[in-house]
Amino acid sequence: MRGKIYWILAALLALSCSKDGMNPGAGGGRDSIRNIPHEMIVLGNRLENPYKTENMSKALASIYPTKAGLVAVQPTDLYVRFLPKNQQELDMLKESDISLLDHPLDYDILVEGDWYHDPEVADDAVTWQYAVVPVDFNFPDIEYQIIHNCFIPDDSENLRSTGIDWEAVERQAYILTGNESRLNDLTLTKSTKVTPSGRITIVDESANGGKAFGVAGVRVSCNSFVRFAHTYTDRDGYYVMPKNFSANLRYRLVFENEKGFSIGVNMILVPASVSTLGKAGPEGISAEITSSSEAKLFRRCVVNNAAYDYISRCRYDDMNILPPPYDLRLWIFHSLDESSAVMLHHGAVVDSEGIAGFLGQYASLLKYFLPDITIGAKNNLDYASLYSTVCHELAHASHFAQVGTGYWNKYIRYIIQSYINTGDPYGDGVSPEAGYCGLGESWAYYLESLMYKERYGGSIPSFGNSFWFYPQIFRYLDERGLDRSDIFSVLEANVTTKEELKSALIRSYPHKRTIIEQVFGRYVN
């Protein structure tokens, strides 16, 4: 979609806010990933899976010919693929806590990328999702296929008691299946596995003295064939995988954060966006991301950090406001200007047929991945502008958590009707239900301004001050002793106009009555 239709999309994905390259890791031996492509994966030839039960049996017999008949190699895991057909089936898979990839695990990768879509699956449907599950996995009622029975050795007491060097057997399976080149020279020399670890960082040129800091709470995943591991970075970007490996690995960031939000991507039908980090040794990979990195990767990491920061700061000893709902879904639209907090995934209901008529190519996404937050990234090219936008939309999400869907539906209806009538989603401020918009936007612009100042210093920016709803009311109160927590506490579902806000503030803070009356007298006719 182009031009004006993008604007309509932003308005209909409600609460639109009309506001005035990767570098190599620093660790020794870490591969440079500067030139990794981030489009569709290109598959090569199918490979022989060394972890197939029969291949591990052959490797055992090759190294321990006298023990092969005494030690049975039984399947420990299943290499499978699922074909979910709707949102419920995707959620069922997500709740199973298994690592899903949208491409097969036993193919050579000719060209790295962030996504793959099986050519035999319709473009508007979810593609096959590949996974490795325990042999006793309780399969949900979702179409699936078992590709291989696998034996994936671990460090359990049962395996150690056999007296067999299973690491050597695993390496031999790679050799016998023609995959010796995928083994790492380090592990071949030392005959031992390595635990992947590293650090993922990002640079905000306007903060932290321009020094890199961690990409926080993001999921890091790696695999060699069907041997998987994943973990989350800590707040400083460090990670350590829970498993050891002897082969070279493919690494990726999965934008599903430990704080309870995921970042999706338009027209890529996966629950959370994936950014490949490419191939590296089993010792791990590190990466420093900057504004000159691949654009989608940079934006995803900024949105990730901004949301992590916001949610972390909602706690009692900091901002002391309700955090956004758990399992928050954010979409980044790289070709849109406007952002929104539509909260569809959490129950805000708009005429979906009407929205779909405007969404065009994006309509098919609604039935799979209803968004809560949409981030228009077209002109948000630097860290600071993206950070500001995310804070604004998450302020809306906190407000939603307090007032509920009934309030939000009226808010959305006003936005849509205002755009239809006037071409401005904020309207004229006098139409029915204008108060919902006025209060919601005042709160979001106010909190956005505070968080921007707290991150970047200087004076408080005047975001939104030219609009009819005057967010400077909250700033005025803040400067005179009512902080963001005090203000947020009165933004309840029964407060829908500036007059009701004034009354609620006076009831809650009678000692500030004079100041409250002064500011409302100045900005409210």
Segments and roles (model prediction):
Residues 50-57, 61-63, 196, 201-226:
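Short, ordered, surface-exposed loop/turn motifs in non-cytosolic proteins
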Residues 21-157:
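Long, solvent-exposed N-terminal ectodomains/accessory regions
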Residues 401-433:
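Post-HEXXH active-site segment of zinc metalloproteases
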Residues 37-40, 44-60, 64-70, 74-76, ...:
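Pan-zinc metallopeptidase signature
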Residues 343-386, 390, 394-404:
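Active-site scaffold of zinc-dependent metalloenzymes
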Residues 242-244, 291-332, 336-343:
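Zn2+-dependent metallopeptidase catalytic core
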Residues 394-411, 443, 451:
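Catalytic Zn2+-binding segment of zinc metalloproteases
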Residues 224-238:
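Short, acidic Ser/Thr/Gly-rich low-complexity loop/linker segments typical of extracellular
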